């Protein structure tokens, strides 16, 4: 099998009503096997508000009570996932919508950063890579919503979509991970840096060249490398096929 690409799109991007059409057109042109991981976005918060429940975030992670989990699962698995799958199928792509609950695809433990209890927020501990490879061998594109199965309690958990994408790419040996963003890549002096190593990233952060909202993006890229991805790119839709900034383990050739 040729190189697998795991493509992650955020809920923020999906909040743009024009984004899905552009994404569908771009993915239709790919020749290699693809796995798509997506986030949630404003629709989850809107549904939580309509239910009269509190919206709370800690370091970008949604505090998820059992009631909020029910709503999150309904929106991200039932509405957003199926919207994406419908668009892809209508474009001729053999897409299949899944969450981490299906086939026990993603298993997790409660995520407790710095000891904080975020409720039903999980951290992926296992991915059924064999199941994904089987679906890919059939010529299908798995579209994965970021809900995982608790490894010890059997409950559903809300998982950060970046973490899901990192874990999936790591489970598919040699896979490339592509983070689709609203920027064309890491910019230095207004130009996209085509390639970076972990050492170069740390130097650019220390020097203040990489700052603000780009820092968590590059940190996620480095985390994906550590989890086993062969390479990682940060791109926008225009650069989805071969553009953006590529992160690799080793030294870059001159």
UniProtKB/Swiss-Prot annotation:
GO terms for cellular component: cytoplasm. Substrate binds at residues 40-41, 62, 158. Pathway: Amino-acid biosynthesis; L-arginine biosynthesis; N(2)-acetyl-L-ornithine from L-glutamate: step 2/4. It is found in: Cytoplasm. InterPro entries: AceGlu_kinase-like_sf, AcgluKinase_fam, ArgB, Asp/Glu/Uridylate_kinase. It comes from the Bacteria. The record marks 8, 217 as: Transition state stabilizer. Gene3D superfamilies: Acetylglutamate kinase-like. Its EC number is 2.7.2.8. This is Acetylglutamate kinase. The gene is argB.
């Amino acid at each position: 099998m040729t190189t697998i690409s795991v493509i992650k799109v955020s809920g923020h991007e999906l909040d743009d009503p024009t984004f899905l059409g552009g994404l569908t057109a771009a993915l239709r042109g790919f020749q290699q096997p693809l796995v798509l991981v997506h986030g949630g976005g404003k629709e989850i918060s809107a549904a939580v508000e309509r239910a009269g429940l509190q919206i709370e975030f800690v370091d970008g992670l949604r505090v998820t009570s059992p009631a909020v989990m029910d709503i999150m699962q309904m929106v991200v698995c039932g509405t957003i996932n199926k919207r994406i799958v419908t668009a892809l199928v209508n474009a001729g792509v053999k897409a299949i919508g899944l969450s981490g609950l299906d086939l026990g695809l993603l298993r997790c433990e409660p995520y407790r950063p710095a000891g904080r209890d975020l409720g039903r927020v999980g951290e992926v501990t296992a991915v059924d890579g064999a199941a994904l490879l089987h679906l890919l061998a059939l010529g299908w594109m798995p579209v994965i919503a970021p809900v995982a199965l608790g490894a010890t309690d059997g409950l559903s958990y809300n998982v950060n979509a970046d973490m899901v994408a990192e874990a999936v790419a790591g489970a598919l040996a040699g896979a490339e991970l592509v983070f689709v963003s609203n920027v064309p890549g890491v910019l230095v002096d207004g130009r996209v840096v085509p390639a970076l190593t972990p050492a170069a990233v740390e130097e650019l952060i220390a020097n203040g060249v990489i700052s603000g909202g780009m820092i968590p993006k590059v940190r996620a890229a480095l985390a994906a490398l550590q989890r086993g991805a062969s390479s990682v790119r940060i791109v926008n839709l225009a650069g989805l096929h071969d553009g953006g900034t590529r992160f690799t383990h080793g030294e870059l050739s001159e």
